[in-house]
């Protein structure tokens, strides 16, 4: 039993020695490392590793999380508090959008400012020269993929900019 334990210790020390020789090759200079030297160099390496990673792996304690949450909550609630007429949430984008409708087919600059990172759902516009029947601003079920009406969801924009609709198409926005 003692032989097996010593064999395991010696095997582990030999593995540590070979690892340390690669890392501390300039300090070892081909001398035979004793067991105490191997252990000292191992401790030195682990401490240097901990010191180098200390700034990178800051683990917040349980006390920091609630205080950070409480610190950010007033700013969020101030940003999202009801407007002057208590009609809903006060948001810069919502205030700019209040004057318009939920469908937008005209100004591409407004579309890119109001929804820089939200995908738009394209729907066919009213037929040219015909009477305008009331349409639901919502696409039919399955309209996000491909349906019999030909409504397609646009591919996600790589630069988070809203794309301009094709002529004769309107954009439905949920706000």
UniProtKB/Swiss-Prot annotation:
GO molecular function term, any single one: DNA-binding transcription repressor activity, RNA polymerase II-specific
Region (Disordered) residue spans: 124-175
UniProt xrefs under InterPro entries: bHLH_dom (IPR011598), HES_HEY (IPR050370), HLH_DNA-bd_sf (IPR036638), Orange_dom (IPR003650)
Keyword flag Transferase: no
Pfam families listed in its UniProt record: HLH
UniProt entry keywords in alphabetical sequence: DNA-binding, Nucleus, Repressor, Transcription, Transcription regulation
Tissue expression profile of the protein: Expressed exclusively in Purkinje cells.
GO annotation (BP), single: trochlear nerve development
Subunit structure: Transcription repression requires formation of a complex with a corepressor protein of the Groucho/TLE family.
UniProt protein name: Transcription factor HES-3
């Amino acid at each position: 039993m003692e032989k097996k334990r010593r064999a395991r210790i010696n095997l582990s020390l030999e593995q540590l020695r070979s690892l340390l020789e690669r890392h501390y090759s300039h300090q070892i200079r081909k001398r035979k490392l004793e067991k105490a030297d191997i252990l000292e160099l191992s401790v030195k390496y682990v401490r240097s590793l901990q010191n180098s990673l200390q700034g990178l792996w800051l683990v917040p304690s349980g006390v920091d999380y609630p205080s950070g949450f409480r610190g950010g909550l007033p700013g969020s609630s101030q940003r999202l508090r009801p407007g002057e007429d208590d009609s809903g949430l006060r948001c810069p984008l919502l205030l700019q959008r209040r004057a318009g409708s939920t469908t937008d087919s005209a100004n591409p600059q407004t579309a890119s400012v109001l929804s820089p990172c939200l995908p738009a759902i394209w729907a066919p516009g009213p037929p040219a020269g015909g009477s305008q029947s009331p349409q639901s601003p919502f696409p039919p079920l399955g309209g996000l993929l491909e349906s019999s009406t030909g409504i397609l969801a646009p591919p996600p924009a790589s630069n988070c900019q809203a794309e301009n609709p094709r002529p004769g198409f309107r954009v439905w926005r949920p706000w």
